[in-house]
Amino acid sequence: MTPCLLIAGPTAAGKTALSLAAAERVGGEIINADSMQVYAGLPLITAQPDAAERARAPHHLFGSIDPAIRYSVGQWTSDVLALISDIRGRGNVPILVGGTGLYFNALTRGLAPVPEIGDAARARAAALLDADGLAGLRAEALRLDPVATNRVDAADRQRLLRIVEVGFETGTALSVFQADTVPPLEPAAWRGIVIEPDREALYRRIDQRFEHMLEAGALDEVAAFMQRDLDPDLPASKALGVPPLIAHLRGEMSLDEARDNAKRDSRRYAKRQGTWFRNQAASWSRIGTLDSEAAISALADILDQPPG
């Protein structure tokens, strides 16, 4: 059985082009592993593959979830395992592509069986963050679960919130749940590739890509999204670029300010992604260029090597 191919990397690193090259080379079908690209209604601002790209290979879980839904990593994992089975049943190779490290961890290391977080625990953690800031949130996370907290970046707001929410909801440390997990994919069933480009070159591409998004109509897309009046705490409402463009549309900042904030947020996110993949996917193969042709050539070399 040909292993699944996992292609990861920071935002704007060229993962879509690489996944298409891989699909055409091995007879693959592409599965989304980006937590924002799952949502409908935001194809431009979340950089989902366009119609021409989708025509080159079958694509799954892109723009398929209503943004009013909180789509959890557990739901994603369940959906992906079913897709992997279907794709293999057709004799094709599953190719998972994206930048959400938690998704890749869920597949390759297992998903902790944490109970559903209730509204009260979620609100309590959010109130703590509002009152005491990120430093206060991290202090509470360290109190509740020093093991899990010391594994995450001190600036990783989402993961720190998760640690605190689990502690508030269950009275048990997240690391306790994580200690007894079985990975859905055995090591022999997958091989991983990380795109790890020069940081300054990546930052330039991030800035250029956001300009292209605006030219393609991202502001109108966000305006339509805004009309749904969704909870600003929903994951889709926090997609990169969405909050500053909404602030601009509400008259709270100029378009130039929104543009600068969106680029800044994307660069910071890319930095966190790079750190995560260096630490959590250290054994994966590396591609260190943003040049599409060079990256595809490097991919071919990796695929020519025997798995393992």
From Swiss-Prot:
Species this chain originates from: Maricaulis maris (strain MCS10)
Quaternary structure (record): Monomer.
Keywords assigned: ATP-binding, Magnesium, Nucleotide-binding, Transferase, tRNA processing
EC code: 2.5.1.75
Start and end residues of each stretch annotated as Interaction with substrate tRNA: 34-37, 158-162
MF GO annotations: ATP binding; tRNA dimethylallyltransferase activity
Binding positions (substrate): 11-16
Site (Interaction with substrate tRNA): 100, 122
UniProt protein name: tRNA dimethylallyltransferase
Cofactor(s) annotated in UniProt: Mg(2+)
NCBIfam families: miaA (TIGR00174)
Function: Catalyzes the transfer of a dimethylallyl group onto the adenine at position 37 in tRNAs that read codons beginning with uridine, leading to the formation of N6-(dimethylallyl)adenosine (i(6)A).
